[in-house]
Amino acid sequence: HAVIIEGFAAYDDEDTLMARVRDSWPSAFDVRGEERLRGIGHYMSPKVWVGQFGFTFYHAATVPLNVGLHKDHDFCPVPGFREVHTQIMGFGKMQQCTERNIATLYLEEPMAPGQTHRPMYDDECNYPWHQFETITPSIFLAVEMLPEGAIPPNL
């Protein structure tokens, strides 16, 4: 499978584009209601499902972002959920930890436009604690892959 994002670099001014995004996308906290997202400059596009694949763009306006480490996705109770992130604009990093504590950081992958981090789930789709962190204001794409038998949620 492949995703092609046409025209992702076709804008005149990055700051103007990101301001337009903030004006049109709701905050991730307003959509998801997760306490770790409260008060953070983190915005999300409407999620689009194509079969078992979910696509959501996120605008990370706050530097640092501090969305908090997480490893579970409550909307998918079926084992086998997978997810990767692709940097679209700006610079960020995907951080992985052994515990829900940034002091246990064991891998930090810098991400530039067009880059997808390596899969961070094991053969049984278990995740480490992880978070996206900004280096600059950013837009990234989260691609969620549901296992067979899971029904895409209405988020």
Residue ranges and their predicted role:
Residues 2-11, 128-153:
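A short hydrophobic beta-strand segment most commonly corresponding to one strand
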Residues 96-134:
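Short acidic-glycine-tyrosine-enriched beta hairpin
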Residues 47-49, 57, 72-76, 119-121, ...:
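Feature captures hydrophobic
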Residues 1-59:
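A short, N-terminal "cap"/entry segment at the start of jelly-roll beta-barrel domains
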Residues 57-81:
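A mid-sequence, solvent-exposed acidic-amphipathic segment
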Residues 70, 98-99, 154-155:
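Short coil/turn segments at secondary-structure boundaries
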Residues 79-98:
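Short, conserved beta-strand element in jelly-roll/cupin
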Residues 104-107, 151-155:
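A short, polar/proline- and glycine-enriched secondary-structure boundary/capping micro-motif
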